[in-house]
Design a protein with these regions (language model features):
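Short amphipathic alpha-helix that is part of the acyltransferase structural core
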Residues: 1-50, 54-58
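A short beta-turn/loop motif at secondary-structure boundaries
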Residues: 41-46, 69, 137-138
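Short beta-strand micro-motifs in enzyme catalytic cores
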Residues: 47-51, 73-75, 142-146
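Conserved beta-strand in the GNAT
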Residues: 52, 58-68, 74-76, 81
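A conserved beta-turn-beta hairpin within the catalytic core of GNAT-like acetyltransferases
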Residues: 68-77, 87, 106-110, 140-142
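Conserved acetyl-CoA-binding loop-helix of GNAT-fold acetyltransferases
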Residues: 82, 88-101
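Conserved GNAT acetyl-CoA-binding A-motif
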Residues: 96, 103-116
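Conserved catalytic-core motifs of GNAT/GCN5-like acyltransferases
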Residues: 113-115, 125, 130-145
Length: 150
């Protein structure tokens, strides 16, 4: 597989086409594929640093990165998503590692918290995240908070 190109962009730095591609991918996976009706555009995108991964000009991986205090008291990663065509290729692992690096580069080495789909806890565990708290339902999908300590 050709190498994914990674970029970190503030909300205002996203072009209209890039923002459309991000929202389309998030909707494709979180709303359609997972059959989950929820308000994806939650008002938090403007505060996020957006990690976009493209393959031959097509958005295939994406995550939102937040400074401590924006979503949780710790820095956080959310809306972690890969296009189906790159799943199983290691793109998801690369995405999580890039998101962690992004947070550290922007705001220094620190703990990172996320609200993960419970079924993906072992995946995130491979990147140093540990379950933190009890599982909870969010938009009809079981989630659990996970913390990656320093």
């Amino acid at each position: 597989m050709t190498r994914i190109e990674w970029r970190y962009l503030a909300f205002d730095a996203l072009s209209a086409a890039e923002l459309y591609a991000v929202l389309q991918l998030r909707s494709e996976v979180f709303v359609v594929e997972q059959a989950c009706i929820f308000q994806d555009m939650d008002g938090a995108d403007a505060q996020a640093l957006h990690l976009v991964g493209t393959l031959q000009g097509v958005l295939v991986a994406y995550a939102r990165c937040f400074a401590a205090g924006e979503k949780f008291s710790e820095a956080s990663i959310g809306r972690i998503v890969t296009r189906s065509c790159v799943r199983g290729s290691g793109a998801g692992h690369a995405l999580v590692e890039k998101a962690i690096s992004c947070l550290f580069q922007q705001w220094g080495t620190q703990a990172i918290r996320m609200g993960a789909q419970a079924q993906l806890a072992s995946f995130y565990g491979q990147h140093g995240f540990e379950k933190s708290g009890l599982p909870y339902m969010e938009d009809g999908i079981l989630h659990i908070e996970m913390l990656r300590s320093v």
